[in-house]
Design a protein with these regions (language model features):
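Conserved core segment of the aminotransferase class I/II
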Residues: 3, 220-221, 225-296, 300, ...
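Active-site phosphate-binding strand-loop segment of PLP-dependent enzymes
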Residues: 144-213
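PLP-dependent enzyme catalytic core of the Aspartate aminotransferase-like
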Residues: 157-158, 340-349, 355-386
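N-terminal small-domain helix-loop-helix segment of the aminotransferase-like
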Residues: 3-99, 106, 281-283
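Conserved glycine-rich beta-strand-loop-beta hairpin in the small C-terminal domain of fold type I
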Residues: 278, 294-303, 313-326, 360
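Conserved PLP-anchoring active-site segment centered on the Schiff-base-forming lysine
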Residues: 110-132
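A short helix-loop-beta submotif of the ANL/AMP-binding
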Residues: 134-140
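A short helix->loop->beta-strand "cap" motif at the edges of active sites that frequently abuts
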Residues: 137, 194-197, 225-226
Length: 386
């Protein structure tokens, strides 16, 4: 018998600490302005905080129902009908989760079997691929090209096979800041209608959409929503990322499978937070209705402040992120450039290549503008010096 520690064989040997954690740590080390990780430097609504304190004081501190507090699921159903013309069933279609990340993981785990192929659009959020791998799935990536990152539907159709089980899309899209229109959902339906393929629509930034047409949701498409999971996040909507409360909307047969996973991941979600969110949704719908203008102003502050810089600004149709091309500044790759930018100029950003599996030849970085005006102006002043 030896004293050597027993080391498990990794199921995810290629993964280390996420770039978001790395860049935030580097920003803290160098006291840099952190435009890397997508969290605000301002607080959420006072009313929401007051309702949380109220429900805690009232003793709502025990387990919530596994599917979510009834009042919150009812408020979600009402909001969904108001925005997308579809009212999901409160009992069978809506599941409250520990953040959108849990909803994504539970949905992927419920739908993907060993050997199934899952189509993702690169650049893509980094939580998709590990969840697919843990379920034995195979990621099939379709690269979207800057500056507009639109889907080539002929190339998409060519990716489909008898093994395709799932398509994961994200709109508004992190990190490219582009949005889908209803024409995109129509094209998706045309491509998969004859196949047994499910859809996960990651819509955590649904309320941060600057398109004149407003947010296009999979839930507004009658055929697609019968085989789709829509995922959303209260943390993004109410500037409370630390609360980690999200939800998913799906047809009853899909929801039933998602809940089988959910009940053994977290079982239930923070009770007083759910009750407070239900109160907020009912009492102040103007908050989420005003979010496009709120974040448009922040986007424009940063864009205008960078106009005199050597950074090329890409179109931003949604999310709280802005892509910039630094080709005129440096020949470094994007990871090295972000590290240098944090150390030497005191601004932390995210390299776009980390959202892609294949080599990414473009010199693009992502800036988060979910910040106070003073933070954005201070960061822009440093970036103009490049």
């Amino acid at each position: 018998m030896t004293n050597n520690p027993l080391i498990p064989q990794s199921k995810l040997p290629q993964l280390g600490t996420t770039i978001f954690t790395q860049m935030s740590a580097l920003a803290q080390q160098h006291q840099a302005i952190n435009l890397s990780q997508g969290f605000p430097d301002f607080d959420g609504p006072r009313y929401l905080q007051e309702r949380l304190a109220y429900h805690v004081a009232q003793g709502a501190n025990q387990y919530a129902p596994m599917t979510g507090v009834q009042a919150l699921r009812e408020a979600i159903a009402q909001k969904t009908e108001r925005l997308y013309g579809y009212q999901p069933d409160v009992d069978s279609n809506i599941t409250v989760t520990a953040g959108a990340t849990e909803a994504l993981y539970a949905a992927i785990t419920a739908l993907v079997r060993n050997g199934d192929e899952v189509i993702c659009f690169d650049p893509s959020y980094d939580s998709y691929a590990p969840a697919i791998a843990l379920s034995g799935g195979i990621v099939k990536r379709m690269a979207l090209q800057p500056p507009h990152f639109r889907v080539d539907w002929q190339k998409f159709a060519a990716l489909l096979s008898e093994r395709t089980r799932l398509v994961i899309l994200n709109t508004p899209h992190n990190p490219s800041a582009t949005v889908w229109q209803q024409t995109d959902f129509a094209a998706l339906w045309q491509a998969i209608a004859g196949h047994e393929i499910f859809v996960i629509s990651d819509e955590v930034y649904e309320h941060i959409n600057f398109s004149q047409q407003g947010h296009a949701s999979v839930l507004a498409h009658p055929q697609l929503r019968e085989r789709a999971v829509a995922v959303s996040s209260f943390g993004k909507t109410y500037h409370m990322t630390g609360w980690k409360v999200g939800y998913c909307v799906a047809p009853a047969p899909i929801s039933a499978e998602i809940r089988k996973v959910h009940q053994y991941l977290t079982f239930s979600v923070n009770t007083p937070a759910q009750l407070a969110l239900a109160d907020m949704l009912r009492a102040e719908p103007e908050h989420y209705l005003a979010l496009p203008d709120f974040y448009r102003q922040k986007r424009d502050i940063l864009v205008n402040a960078l106009n005199e810089s050597r950074l090329e600004i890409l179109p931003c149709e949604g999310t709280c992120f802005l892509l910039v091309d630094y080709s005129a500044v440096s020949t470094m790759d994007d990871v090295e450039f972000c590290q240098w930018l944090t150390r030497e100029h005191g601004v932390a950003a995210i390299p776009l290549s980390v959202f892609c599996a294949d080599p990414f030849p473009h010199k693009l970085i992502r800036l988060c503008f979910a910040k106070k005006e003073s933070t954005l102006l201070a960061a822009a002043e440093r970036l103009r010096q490049l």
